[in-house]
Design a protein with these regions (language model features):
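C-terminal transmembrane helix and the adjacent membrane-cytosol boundary/short C-terminal tail
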Residues: 39, 101, 106-127, 194-226
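Membrane-helix interface segments
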Residues: 35-43, 71-72, 87, 117, ...
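Periplasmic/extracellular loop-to-transmembrane helix junction in inner-membrane transport proteins
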Residues: 1-19, 31-39, 78-81, 184-191
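Transmembrane-helix boundary motif in ABC transporter permease subunits
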Residues: 16-47, 60-62, 110-112, 116-118, ...
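Transmembrane alpha-helices
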Residues: 19, 97, 104-107, 111, ...
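Membrane-interfacial helix termini and adjacent extracytoplasmic/periplasmic loops
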Residues: 59-96, 167-170
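Interhelical loop and adjacent transmembrane-helix boundary motif
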Residues: 1-5, 166-205
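Non-cytoplasmic
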Residues: 67-70, 145-183
Length: 226
């Protein structure tokens, strides 16, 4: 019998991490796309790093950052009352770390491709940077941002290595669908693995279809984000 907990956990983790990625990633993307500052290349490289490093390496970094003996880990435990590692919240952190760089890269491309005349007109009318971002930039790039969000959700949904390192593979607690498929294959439960694979594949197709739909720019031709 198939245990559907890993699927629901994966969907919850992906949804929460995507919202957090939007809150963090849009500002970083806007900063990189429109401002020059010292160490910009270093920040850009740091954003790209999670896209190229092995997941186990990223997971190790997160263990160092959020382990019980680390300052961040101690602060989290003091606030929440329990350690972060080997909890479902750790799976959110893993997914966030995995998905945010993709969202930043996609959002930055959307911001850089925006016709600068709109921004100049808004500034000439006295719009602040805050108002410019919310009232001009986001509405004009909303479809690209939604497409990037869908791709970030899909990336978070399929994370394996980072989640395994920091959240573990605890059935009923931290086992996501990717980990459940691995366990099913390892234990010889082919039917369970096949069912989960088919379900997650359907979910992925739906997400990618949404991403491709929103990638249609209202000011230009359809462009696929993938």
């Amino acid at each position: 019998m198939v245990d559907w907990f890993p699927l629901w956990l994966s969907l919850r983790v992906a949804a929460i991490s995507t919202v957090l990625a939007l809150a963090l990633g849009l500002w970083v993307a806007w900063l990189l796309a429109n401002h020059s500052f010292r160490w910009k290349e270093v920040v850009d490289a740091a954003v790209t790093l999670p896209l190229v490093l092995p997941p186990t390496v990223l997971g190790y970094y997160l263990l160092v950052l959020f382990g019980r003996s680390s300052p961040l880990g101690k602060i989290y435990e003091w606030i929440v009352g329990h350690p972060l590692v080997f909890t479902w919240q750790a799976a959110v952190v893993a997914a966030l770390f995995h998905a945010t760089p993709l969202l930043i890269k996609s959002a930055r491309a959307a911001f850089e491709n925006l016709d600068p005349s709109y921004e100049r007109a808004a500034r000439n009318l006295g719009a602040s940077e805050w108002r410019l971002f919310w009232r001009v930039v986001l509405p004009l790039t909303r479809r690209s941002i939604l497409a990037a969000s869908a791709l970030a959700f899909a990336r978070a949904l399929g994370d394996f290595g980072i989640t395994l390192m920091i959240a573990g593979n605890i059935p009923g607690r931290t086992q996501t669908v990717a980990l459940a498929i691995y366990d099913a294959v390892e234990s010889g439960k082919g039917n369970v693995a096949l069912t989960l694979v088919l379900v997650i594949s359907v979910v992925a197709v739906v997400i990618l279809s949404v991403a491709n739909h929103f990638a249609t720019s209202p000011f230009g031709p359809r462009q696929s984000p993938i």
